[in-house]
Amino acid sequence: MDQFPSLVMRAHAAARQAGFPLTREEAGPDRPSACLPGVGRFLAVLAAGCGGGRIGELGTGAGIGAGWIASAMPADCALITVEIDEPLARAARELLTADSRVEVITGDALRVIPGRGPFDLLFADSGVRDPADFAVLVSLLRIGGRIVMDDVTPEHGLPPDASLRADDIKRSFFTGEPRLTWTEVVLPDLRNSLLVGTRTT
């Protein structure tokens, strides 16, 4: 795979043109941001192993994460990506329209995704914050399926009162979820990490 697949490059260009934040720092605490390159490459590695499977993405955004996934997944794999913001969903649909394996849906991902499983890979890139919703997502995985959540601050970067950090809710859920074997992957910038878990039961 190229360092940056052409589909990802086009998604980046569209994001810049639309003013969509490319980093969490640009976005601030209450806005979504684009899929970082380190996260995208990680997703590509997982997607490449989903032959004959189904991948779900909660929060299409500018389509960068979907671009990484679609560029790597096998020909017999399907990607369902859901975005609640109509202009973003429309732009991503235009970007991905040539790939019949990809379906871009406008709507609330937590309402749409449960009806489309089971999944071999789920990328929860939207503002999922409720542990009950996290548990639902795990239930949508096949045994052996994987879930990835990004926009997490590494533990060494958390403030003293870490209980107030929204991303620590994700880490706490993964820690206490008995159906997952999981780990945290710190990205090269040392300011961002992602959580990845495999459903075992």
Model-derived features with residue positions:
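A short alpha-helical cap/connector motif
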Residues: M1-L121, V128-R146, V152-T201
